[in-house]
């Protein structure tokens, strides 16, 4: 099977969302023909890695977790030409904007199933993903709740299927109004990496409490620091991760100094390969995150045999209870949280070891091998159902691109949509027989309102690219 995956994050960036996108592509490439389309320093196809995965890079700028792609006419044409040549059976995007939107247009024109994994709760999209990592107040402010809802509604309507990570995500998508096909397929992990972790020695006087993730308001480390005030001094809180926004780590450090806490260790971001060794030394993994669709680090903690104490959220509700740690309500006080941590750390060795074993069993089915099988089955079902592009779909696509600013990008997309509507056979074969030197036809339709934010996509990407490049990005 030939699959084109799309992510807004380079390898090693974007937190759990970026990590799972690249890991999924790498795992797929072991048995399938796969390309990952993602930000890069230059636009073009890069050599494959040891698994056979190829990277098609889209020129982007930015030195943080998120890089802004420069969706110029040249870039869009290069991406379309590559997809025409690769001719994937399925296009699978992890984000509903920018590169993902361009990939969706190509898939619809070519009658190729388009799948989107929803890593966010649609009603709270601005609190997740790329916007969480952007340090660009102007762009963040432009993404109002109303606009983001319209974007998602229209993007979802052009998907052949959505993937929900769990039942809470499925419920959220249905509540949002999506009535199309949804597959429930969880995030995968390489469980073998954590299977060898030894359980922490519960008899040790010093107890290590670990949290792994970005330092951010959503992750709610403030609450963990407040809980630390109610724990003995030999309970050490280790915060592994970097701040998403400048000054946030310093804010947390000031809070520690105000409370006189010397037992909070800001360990910073560490290579993901070192996470198992940190979990192995942890007596409890703690989480006060306000929202987590399906947290990779909670899965990894459980896979390592580390009990979890957490405040209620989508992931904690799904995976954590008294058999593997403790789940508290959102309204629980920091003192109550601390009491639960101390209770777990005070268990007799045999009871603590039982928690550790239960934790491993809780996530035993979340290995990548199982996730890949579920995903392949979903793809095959979609391929069987996929019909040729209809006139209605073609009209919808024209409405989509008509909202783009006048210029070469809009003309390219309009031309190719119209050609796909006229030719019932393979678009790739059809394009090979047509002269691409013909001047692109002018747009004939009045701008529609179907995709309110689509027009801003190209503008925002180019403006954002220039802003980020102006911060000191190297030139080619």
PLM segments and residue spans:
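N-terminal subdomain of nucleotide-sugar transferases
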Residues: 1-44, 51-57, 229, 398-401, ...
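Aromatic "clamp/platform" in nucleotide-sugar-dependent glycosyltransferases that forms part
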Residues: 290
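Carbohydrate-associated surface elements
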Residues: 168, 188
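Conserved donor-binding/catalytic core segment of Leloir-type glycosyltransferases
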Residues: 4, 201-230, 238
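Short hydrophobic beta-strand element within catalytic cores of glycosyltransferases
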Residues: 307-310
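Glycosyltransferase donor-sugar binding loop
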Residues: 212, 236-253, 268
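Short alpha-helical donor nucleotide-sugar binding micro-motif in glycosyltransferases
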Residues: 156, 269, 277-282
